[in-house]
């Protein structure tokens, strides 16, 4: 075990390599560029590959191709680049391609605030592509978690054959803290079919089929069209229903294993629901409010998606407070679920600055 002092983006790169990532394709964009710089420097040392593409469309396409070539692959970007990736991210869902996309969020829309923090891409990571699919998205709030959650993202991607998002922001990406580089970390690798050439690489009777890859003797056919068990196009209603339901259900039926959170005093009259950088402020505000005699708790979402409906439905709080560095995105998910609460309060903040504890306290005290 080693302890190092580093930037969040650097921790992300270290976590990726620890997880077994051996391919990175990207296009420089503030505030994520340090991830690309670190991967360009470190991947060749471990036999990996770095390629700077012409844009973010090409970047995610290269990542998908590398994954089907048998490599653990990732890219990193920010809001404008994330928008460009959405079509190919949809292709990755349909082809069940394991990969990791790190989004260091900045202020938008459009070019927005390249050097300032935001959480404005949270709805996009869930609904950015068309069609029916489920998402796994992690929200780190520290440099340590940039390292840990990147490893977790690769494990989820490999286990469930799905693109996984690490939804950080400029604050976490650029802050510097100590990071414990653990020696004994579980690393999950994708399963491959035992049969070659593998007549049915997409069997409908398996929730998560093994993944054949190019160059290893498998019969591999990949298409974004609705496809049958062989991977060949078949747009019949029956085939589409079986395929898409399986793609959706492999996440829905495993949500209890996927969903991660932390919290305190969930039976309180006032509960904060938070994620990412604002979680740091929430912990200060909760402590201050308790010192004033209030019954306060919090839930921090580690996985924002799949959304923890069952957890939030159990809350008995009269007041649920949702701080976000946007004008309300996850707030609407919380409002949808927390029907028992008398109030669901959004404490929004844009402009690139993190909430201050007193702002959250005022939302509670009125």
Curated annotation (Swiss-Prot):
Catalytic activity field: 2 oxidized [2Fe-2S]-[ferredoxin] + 2-oxoglutarate + CoA = succinyl-CoA + 2 reduced [2Fe-2S]-[ferredoxin] + CO2 + H(+)
CDD domains to which the protein is assigned, alphabetical: TPP_PYR_PFOR_IOR-alpha_like
Signal peptide feature range: none
Record GO biological process: organic acid metabolic process; response to oxidative stress; sulfur compound biosynthetic process
Pfam families on file: PFOR_II, POR_N
Keywords carried by this UniProt record: Oxidoreductase
Single GO term (MF): 2-oxoglutarate synthase activity
Enzyme class (EC, first level): oxidoreductase
E.C. code: 1.2.7.3
Subunit text: Heterotetramer of the KorA, KorB, KorC and KorD subunits.
Protein name (database record): 2-oxoglutarate synthase subunit KorA
Organism this protein belongs to: Methanocaldococcus jannaschii (strain ATCC 43067 / DSM 2661 / JAL-1 / JCM 10045 / NBRC 100440)
Gene name for this UniProt entry: korA
């Amino acid at each position: 075990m080693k302890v190092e002092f580093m930037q969040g983006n650097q921790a992300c790169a270290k976590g990726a390599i620890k997880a077994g990532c051996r391919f990175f394709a990207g296009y420089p964009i503030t505030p994520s560029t340090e991830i690309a710089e670190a991967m360009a420097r470190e991947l060749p040392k471990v036999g990996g590959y770095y390629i700077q593409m012409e844009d973010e469309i090409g970047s995610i396409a290269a990542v998908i191709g590398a994954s089907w070539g048998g490599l653990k692959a990732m890219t990193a970007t920010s809001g404008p680049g994330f928008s460009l990736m959405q079509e190919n991210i949809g292709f990755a869902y349909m082809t069940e391609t394991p990969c990791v996309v790190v989004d260091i969020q900045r202020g938008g829309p459009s070019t927005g605030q390249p050097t300032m923090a935001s959480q404005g891409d949270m709805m996009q990571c869930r609904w950015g592509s068309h069609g029916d699919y489920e998402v796994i998205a992690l929200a780190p709030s520290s440099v340590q978690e940039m390292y840990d959650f990147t490893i977790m993202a690769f494990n989820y991607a490999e286990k469930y054959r799905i693109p996984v998002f690490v939804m950080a922001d400029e604050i976490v990406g650029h802050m510097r803290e100590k990071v414990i580089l653990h020696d004994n970390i579980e690393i999950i690798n994708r399963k491959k079919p035992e049969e070659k050439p593998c007549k049915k690489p997409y069997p409908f009777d398996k929730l998560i089929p093994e993944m054949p890859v190019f160059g290893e003797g498998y019969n591999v056919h990949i298409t974004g069209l609705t496809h049958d068990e062989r991977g060949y196009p078949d747009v019949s209603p029956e085939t589409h229903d079986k395929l898409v339901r399986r793609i959706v259900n492999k996440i829905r039926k495993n949500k209890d294993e996927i969903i991660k959170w932390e919290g305190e005093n969930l039976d309180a009259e006032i509960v904060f629901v938070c994620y990412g950088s604002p979680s740091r402020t929430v912990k200060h505000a909760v402590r201050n409010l308790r010192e004033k005699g209030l019954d306060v708790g919090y839930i921090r979402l580690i996985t924002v998606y799949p959304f923890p409906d069952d957890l939030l439905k159990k809350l008995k709080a009269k007041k649920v407070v949702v701080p976000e560095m946007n004008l309300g995105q996850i707030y609407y998910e919380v409002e949808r679920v927390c029907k028992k609460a008398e109030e669901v309060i959004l404490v929004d903040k844009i402009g690139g600055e993190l909430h201050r504890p007193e702002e959250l306290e005022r939302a509670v005290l009125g």
